[in-house]
Design a protein with these regions (language model features):
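Short, glycine-/small- and polar/acidic-enriched structural segments
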Residues: 34-213, 229-239, 246-259, 433
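Conserved C-terminal helix/tail region of periplasmic/extracytoplasmic solute-binding proteins
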Residues: 362-444
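Ligand-binding pocket segment of bilobal, Venus flytrap-like solute-binding proteins
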Residues: 95, 107, 207-249, 268, ...
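Secondary-structure end/capping motifs
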Residues: 275-391
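Structured segments of extracytoplasmic/periplasmic soluble domains
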Residues: 69-72, 78, 96, 100, ...
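Short, low-complexity disordered leader/linker segments with a strong preference
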Residues: 1-50, 409-418, 422-444
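Extracytoplasmic/secreted proteins, especially bacterial periplasmic and envelope-associated proteins
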Residues: 65, 70, 92, 96, ...
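Short glycine- and hydrophobic/aromatic-rich loop-to-beta-strand nucleating segment
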Residues: 144-146, 264-267, 271-272
Length: 444
């Protein structure tokens, strides 16, 4: 019997359960136990291979299901003690997952894509290949591109051709340097969003602006001291920049691509293969946390939990507005009135958010090809598909959903969400990725 068949055989015997999370991950920096409430006791009758997993998180909205899973007991309900540790940066998270919990690091956690795929290939881990599995999407939307008040007269917006024609060329001519735009980790989600926004407006991000990496916690100070004029990251940081009157929200990622994929839960494959029942328990707890987060009546409680010093250490009003999608858009601060343009955790107009559609995880690899992020690793569509098929585990999500008792019509069975359309009119058809790449006018 092959390793994979043994794994599936174990899955077939996994007991049905529900989900709860308790939490403390003893991995520096800033390891935390549960936030302001008493952790729920871990169920002792779950018959899991292990009752503990160590996960890393970055304090932005994408991590909310992990924190809520701990605080509200969803993971613990399924017999799993999820120990969360706040990571100082995405680079620290990468280094810690390479170490693994047995080496004092983490087993997995929250990731920008394609970080898990590239860690699996050794492309961002100094050549050390640490195979990982992408298990679920944590959130959709909830990110934005903030601009400094120093360029408020530039009126940067989603549609730069209309609001700010020739802005970047004029800026360079006036200031004697290029406009600086930052992100939190190179060659992943947040750099991809700012690149897509610029390129979709006819601005070549490799020629017309200077792109740089700045850790999320340094966002506010960086904007204040002029390190950068724009920043792409997850809320609450863009919203806080606007609320603190340091800058304004030029565009949200929901405007760039409605119901877009965001960050994902991914875990080392050796942990998953060794602990198939615990993996299913983890997914069930995550799903219940995502369902809870998506209910409007829970937004204020979620904000209160997340705002605590143990978790995000961010003012409560900022998180309340961020979780509800109460943005003020553009230099004029126009209120966003559609809650569906804010962060979504379980359901959207396109269906289930948590399910890791391969069509969506593939897109990040296609963008990596577009910008030649990982030469020698992702140069062709065939390479991208092979990596994607190896890392993205839709089958585990489906198994967990069935055990959780979700109705059959709420459990996706395919690997594609269908055609996707972006703000610039470009369409991504997962059945024809080459057509998507060919349609992109600006690329490397």
């Amino acid at each position: 019997m092959t390793k994979r068949r043994r794994f599936l055989a174990l899955l077939s015997g996994t007991l049905a359960s529900t989900v709860v999370l308790t939490g403390c991950l003893g991995n520096p920096p800033n390891s935390t136990s549960s936030g302001g409430t008493t952790p729920a006791p871990v169920a002792t009758n779950a018959n899991l291979e292990t009752n503990t997993i160590n996960l890393g998180f970055i304090p932005i909205l994408e991590a909310a299901p992990l924190v809520i899973g701990v605080e509200k007991g969803f993971f613990a309900k399924h017999g799993l003690d999820v120990k969360l540790s706040k990571q100082a940066s995405w680079g620290a998270a990468r280094d810690n997952v390479v170490l693994g919990s047995t080496g004092g690091g983490i087993d997995g956690g929250q990731w920008q894509l394609p970080m898990p795929q590239m860690i699996s290939e050794g492309a961002i881990s100094n050549g050390k290949k640490v195979p990982m599995y992408v298990l679920a999407m944590l959130m959709s939307q909830g990110n934005g591109i903030a601009a400094s008040n120093t360029v408020k007269d530039g009126n940067l917006s989603l549609d730069l051709r209309k609001s700010s024609p020739d802005f970047f060329a004029k800026y360079q001519q006036k200031e004697g340097r290029k406009f600086r735009a930052a992100y939190t980790f190179p060659k992943a989600n947040q750099e991809i969003w700012i690149r897509y926004w610029l390129a979709g407006n006819g601005v070549d991000p490799d020629k017309s602006v200077e792109l740089l990496k700045v850790p999320a916690p340094e966002t506010l100070q960086g904007m204040k001291n002029g390190t950068m004029e724009a920043f792409s990251t997850g809320d609450p940081w863009p919203s806080r920049i606007a609320k603190d009157n340091i800058g304004y929200l030029a565009a949200t990622t929901a405007e760039i691509w409605k119901d877009h994929p965001e960050e994902y839960l991914a875990v080392r494959s050796d942990w998953v293969d060794k602990n198939p029942k615990a993996t299913i328990a983890l997914l069930k707890g995550l799903m219940e946390a995502q369902m809870w987060l998506d209910k409007p009546e829970n937004k204020d409680e979620a904000a209160k939990i997340l705002s605590s010093r143990k978790w995000y250490n961010v003012p409560l009003p900022v998180l309340q507005e961020s979780l509800k999608g109460q943005y003020k858009i553009g230099a004029a601060g126009t209120p966003e009135t559609d809650p569906k343009m804010g962060p979504l955790y379980w359901a959207s107009d396109r269906g289930n958010i948590s399910y890791p559609y391969k069509s969506l995880t593939l897109w990040f690899l296609l963008e990596s090809m577009r910008w030649k992020f990982y030469p020698g690793t992702v140069d062709t569509i065939e390479q991208a598909k092979a990596i994607n098929d190896k890392v993205t585990r839709e089958d585990l999500w489906q198994q967990a959903a069935k055990e959780l008792g979700l109705p059959a019509n709420q459990i996706p069975t395919g690997s594609s969400r269908g055609k996707e359309t972006f703000f610039d009119g470009v369409t991504y058809d997962p059945e024809n990725p080459q057509a998507y790449l060919s349609a992109l006018k600006i690329k490397k």
